[in-house]
Amino acid sequence: WTSNRFFRNFGSSTISIDIIMRRRLLSLCAVLCMALVVMAEGKAKYVFYFIGDGMGVNQVNGTETYMAAVEGRIGTSPLCFAQFPYVGLVTTYSGTNGVTDSAAGGTALATGNKTKNGALGIKSDLTTRINSIAALAKSEGKAVGVTTSVSVDHATPASFYAHVKDRNMYHQIGKDLIAAGFDFYAGSDFLQPENNELSGNKDLYTQCREAGYTIARGYADYRKKAKKADKMLLLQTETANKADRTSIPYAIDRQKNDLTLQDITRAAIHFLSQKDTDGFFLMVEGGKIDWACHSNDAATAFKEVIDMDN
């Protein structure tokens, strides 16, 4: 991944990778859908990295079977990413466990390195830092966005910018988000915006603003602020936070003015496209497929898969 080799080598391919299975049907698995939009000479300019957390083969097949049933027929109705020309399966054990978790799995997705369960952006020795594909893209002059339907400091998005030994170090992860300096972040909110022991009297919102980030609350607020913003942090509204700050609502429970993964993706593409850079890298996580499966809620899981596919 040194120099510009990464962007040249992928060329015009599209990839879908089924990854990160957990025990039984309550798997923490991710299907990686990386779509590359290329320039005439074959060098990737726009890289989209879609991760469905908890989305293994069963979740994909179950959703496609459900979609066919809704259409009144037996069989399957293919999801968009399932029709990509290249599909692969990989083993998902972490550096120290047969069953991975979101932190180790996310680090593998973001950096290509296996690590200890719970660790983010560091090797199994819990000391050696490893940089992500997002950091590489930033170092090569690309605009970078990291987005999710859960909190911005959750394990999968944090794998792309943080370097901590414990995924529960949410305040430190938030500080790493700021230090990474990516152009666009989006999710429900921070889980631990305040920690006087680490940050004095400054919460993460204050630190973000001091680092040059504009904070938008909801898609309508983003549209008002985007043009004048240098860097953007898109979060859900304060009203939505009172109900649940850990994530945006499930697709099956969505209300009219709720922030959606489509809103987040649309805003990210818009914001990154207006940056004066040679293309961009964007990671989008559908983070609640896994949560629905932990609750044994098939209907909600299928709706979350469809929502990410949209």
Indicate residue ranges for each PLM-predicted region:
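Active-site His/acidic residue clusters
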Residues: A155-Y161, T239-D253, A268, D276-N310
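Phosphate/oxyanion-binding active-site loops and adjacent basic polyanion-contact surfaces
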Residues: D166, K256-T265, E304-M308
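Hydrophobic h-region of N-terminal signal peptides that target proteins for export
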Residues: V31-M39
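Generic beta-strand/beta-sheet core signal
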Residues: F50-I51, T147, G187-S188, L235-E238, ...
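Sec-dependent signal peptide recognition
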Residues: R22-V31
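N-terminal catalytic scaffold of extracellular/periplasmic and nuclease hydrolases
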Residues: E41-A226, D230-K231, D307
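Active-site regions of oxyanion-processing enzymes, predominantly non-cytosolic
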Residues: G218, Y222-Q236, I264-G287
